From Swiss-Prot:
<feature type="DNA-binding region" description="H-T-H motif">
    <location>
        <begin position="104"/>
        <end position="123"/>
    </location>
</feature>
<keyword id="KW-0804">Transcription</keyword>
<keyword id="KW-0539">Nucleus</keyword>
<dbReference type="GO" id="GO:0005634">
    <property type="term" value="C:nucleus"/>
</dbReference>
<protein>
    <recommendedName>
        <fullName>Transcriptional coactivator nsrH</fullName>
    </recommendedName>
</protein>
<dbReference type="InterPro" id="IPR036388">
    <property type="entry name" value="WH-like_DNA-bd_sf"/>
</dbReference>
<keyword id="KW-0238">DNA-binding</keyword>
<feature type="domain" description="HTH iclR-type">
    <location>
        <begin position="74"/>
        <end position="144"/>
    </location>
</feature>
<comment type="function">
    <text>Transcriptional coactivator; part of the gene cluster that mediates the biosynthesis of the tetrahydroxanthone dimer neosartorin, which exhibits antibacterial activity.</text>
</comment>
<dbReference type="InterPro" id="IPR029063">
    <property type="entry name" value="SAM-dependent_MTases_sf"/>
</dbReference>
<keyword id="KW-0805">Transcription regulation</keyword>
<dbReference type="InterPro" id="IPR036390">
    <property type="entry name" value="WH_DNA-bd_sf"/>
</dbReference>
<dbReference type="GO" id="GO:0003677">
    <property type="term" value="F:DNA binding"/>
</dbReference>
Length: 444
């Protein structure tokens, strides 16, 4: 398809998506339908918004030349990000009324910043829909900027991008030189080491610096496209759980690895994992859950207690001794940080999967989509940006889909092997979970 035909196709897709969103907005609050980002908004609205953004990205790719590309980077990426940091540093957003407007001079005097600098920053961010100048030398919130005031976690994410992620990312060339000249392990040559005290791991720094940890979690949640426990539980409801446990005791084993995801580790791996079990227990009252935690020192608190959830421990890589369950949910570690751990964890489940037909193993690794496989290129860009950020800050990385499939295919014993039976996808078409069963070899 040539560029002109692609433009026409994108035009038709855009018109359809806008009509869909307008149809919903016509039955209610138009502005709310457009600006609301609640996870509870109707699925058709979220789909229409996603389609509009996806088509907009395709259009930009089709018509953007090299000069346009650089100008976009200069204004909408580097300078806008710097402006957000500046606004956050001087707490400007909190001084602007949520309703109406205020003189820019008054805001400058209140925050003790130069009026001319504030005016320039407001006028630049306004081009991105962040703040506006309703009349000359006055500033007012837009729905976008107001959300950064009402939800400070959004500003934390922006501050992490500007203070940590972007500076560390820009140090990649220096890091490559460090690795070439040093005989130390790769983890000693990450950009994070150049920004933090020598030898200090990023996640250790997060534990020692609550502000950094808070901003890191906000970045993962808002900017990095990380799936939450709610997201994963929602995807798992795509399975027919009553059918999976039919004729069995309804027992589900869930294994949480303490360093499966440093976002979860920082907020408490037990809390993250039991939150998935609690959500599934809420939807399926006949099921009983056993949550296995890899670190025996991690305890389940009273707040996390549920009458149908039992907590135990199992060290990573040790044999799975909890037999008799209908389903095993396994949160895999990073492939790059522990390349053999994924293979080992799959292998230690061979015995329980082989013991009875129909037993299901559900894997919830953080997977990178196959290149170019998603309808929305921004979704893939977000996932790959997160993967690069993890590598730059902690020398970790996420698993490619093909890597996981190849790994599963190699796990076997003398009687059979593991096979993938389905892929469970989120609303944006990312694979969130993979279901696996044991398949016996056919008689020769």
């Amino acid at each position: 398809m040539d560029d002109l035909a692609q433009l026409q196709s994108c035009s038709n897709e855009l018109a359809t998506a806008i009509t869909s969103l307008a149809s919903y907005a016509g039955s209610g609050n138009t502005q709310q339908a457009i600006n609301n980002q609640s996870p509870f908004e109707p699925e058709e609205v979220q789909r229409a918004k996603g389609n509009i953004l996806a088509v907009a990205t395709k259009l930009r790719t089709l018509i953007c030349g090299p000069t346009d590309f650089l100008q976009h980077l200069a204004s909408q990426v580097s300078e806008i990000l710097a402006c957000l940091r500046w606004l956050g540093e001087f707490q400007i957003l909190a001084c602007i009324p949520l309703m109406g407007s205020a003189p820019i001079k008054d805001i400058a005097d209140l925050t003790n910043v130069p009026e001319s600098r504030l005016r320039r920053i407001i006028r630049l961010t306004a081009t991105a829909g962040f703040l506006r100048e309703p009349e000359r030398d006055h500033v007012a919130h837009t729905p976008l900027s107001a959300s950064f005031f009402s939800n400070p976690s959004l500003l934390d994410a922006a501050m992490f991008l500007s203070e940590s992620a972007a500076p560390i990312a820009l140090q990649m060339p220096q890091t490559a030189q460090v690795k070439e000249k040093s005989s130390s392990p790769p983890s000693n040559g990450t950009p994070c080491d150049l920004a933090l005290p020598r030898g200090t791991e990023f996640h250790t720094a997060c534990k020692r610096r609550p502000k950094l940890n808070r901003q890191w979690l906000a970045y993962l949640h808002h900017a990095a496209g990380l799936h939450t426990a709610d997201d994963i539980a929602a995807v798992l409801t795509q399975l027919d759980w009553p059918k999976l446990t039919n004729g069995r005791d309804g027992s589900i084993i869930e294994y949480a690895i303490s360093r499966v995801d440093h976002c979860h580790a920082q907020v408490g791996v037990s809390s993250w994992s039991t939150s998935i079990a609690r959500r599934l227990a809420h939807f399926y009252p006949a099921l009983h859950f056993t949550v296995q935690i890899s670190d025996p020192a991690v305890a389940i608190t009273q707040e996390e207690f549920h009458p149908r959830i039992t907590a135990t421990s199992r060290i990573l890589g040790t044999r799975q001794t909890a037999a008799g369950a209908a389903v095993y949910i396994l949160h895999l570690p990073f492939a790059s940080s522990s390349p053999s751990a994924v293979m080992t964890e799959l292998a230690v489940h061979l015995d329980v999967l082989r013991s009875r037909s129909g037993i299901l193993l559900i894997l919830t690794p953080r997977l990178l989509p196959q290149p170019g496989s998603l309808p929305d290129p921004e979704v893939e860009a977000t996932a790959r940006s997160r993967d690069l950020a993890l590598g730059q800050m902690a020398d970790e990385g996420e698993m490619e889909m093909l890597e996981l499939l190849e790994t599963i295919d190699t796990v076997r014993d003398s009687l059979g092997k593991l096979v993938v039976t389905s892929k469970l996808r989120s609303r944006n078409n990312l694979v969130v979970a993979v279901t696996v069963e044991y398949q016996r070899d056919l008689p020769s």
